């Protein structure tokens, strides 16, 4: 029903069923994992009105599991990418995996999937830094930031006749700012992640 993927590792499709509605994947050597993908295999859909909450569990200093809600998968959203690298020192949250006898070993984390009502999924709050930001939201933010900067800088524009000479201050012509703004927009449209290179 579910699959789990970590970069550089084989895809896991054989989840351990620990209850009728709960499934677990082991993640050995979890300290070296940054992101995990959880997805439906497409062979068995969720029953009508149901979905799956996705949890991440890692052993605390005493070896006890610390569970954190990452998000969910549904028939309408059959896959999700989660960032888990920053979660290993966070606090746990309420979870449905309670006191189940799940075999645990040190340095092995787990992804848990709990089949629940869609209404219940909508009311849950995932841990804040588990979601991977999308390029669209980043592009929107960058566009708003560019617009704000250009509008702010332009609000100080004066003509040469209005300028008061001041040898200690530097001035940037408005057309230079406009040229930078247009160049940045063009590059952002071509590749939203160009700034990483």
Curated annotation (Swiss-Prot):
One CC-aspect GO term: cytosol
Pfam families linked: Hikeshi-like_C, Hikeshi-like_N
Major location category of this protein: cytoplasm
Chain positions covered by the region annotation Flexible linker region involved in nuclear import of HSP70 proteins: 124-134
Disulphide bonds in the chain: none
Subcellular location as annotated: Cytoplasm; Cytoplasm, Cytosol; Nucleus
Keywords, sorted A to Z: Cytoplasm, Nucleus, Protein transport, Transport
Region feature Required for F-X-F-G repeats-nucleoporins recognition and nuclear import, mapped onto this chain: 18-55
Role this protein plays: Acts as a specific nuclear import carrier for HSP70 proteins following heat-shock stress: acts by mediating the nucleoporin-dependent translocation of ATP-bound HSP70 proteins into the nucleus. HSP70 proteins import is required to protect cells from heat shock damages. Does not translocate ADP-bound HSP70 proteins into the nucleus.
PANTHER family in the cross-refs: HIKESHI FAMILY MEMBER, PROTEIN HIKESHI
Subunit relationships: Forms an asymmetric homodimer; required for binding and nuclear import of HSP70 proteins. Interacts with ATP-bound HSP70 proteins. Interacts with NUP62 and NUP153 (via F-X-F-G repeats). Interacts with HSPA8.
Family classification: Belongs to the OPI10 family.
Stated name of the protein: Protein Hikeshi
Recorded name of the encoding gene: HIKESHI
């Amino acid at each position: 029903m579910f699959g789990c993927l970590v970069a550089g590792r084989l895809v896991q499709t054989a989840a351990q069923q620990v209850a009728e509605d709960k499934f677990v994947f082991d993640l050995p050597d979890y300290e070296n994992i940054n992101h995990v993908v959880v997805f439906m295999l497409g062979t068995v859909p969720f029953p009508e009105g149901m979905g799956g909450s996705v949890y991440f569990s890692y052993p605390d200093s005493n070896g006890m599991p610390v569970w954190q809600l990452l998000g969910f998968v549904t028939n309408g959203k059959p896959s999700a990418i989660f960032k888990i690298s920053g979660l290993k020192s966070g606090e746990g949250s309420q979870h449905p995996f309670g006191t189940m006898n799940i075999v645990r070993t040190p340095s092995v984390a787990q992804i848990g999937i709990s089949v629940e009502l869609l209404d219940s999924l909508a009311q849950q709050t995932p841990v804040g830094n588990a979601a991977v930001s999308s390029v669209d939201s980043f592009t929107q933010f960058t566009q708003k930031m560019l617009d704000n900067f250009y509008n702010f800088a332009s609000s100080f524009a004066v003509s040469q006749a209005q300028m008061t000479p001041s040898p200690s201050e530097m001035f940037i012509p408005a057309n230079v700012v406009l040229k930078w703004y247009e160049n940045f927009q063009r590059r952002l449209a071509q590749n939203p992640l160009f700034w990483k290179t």
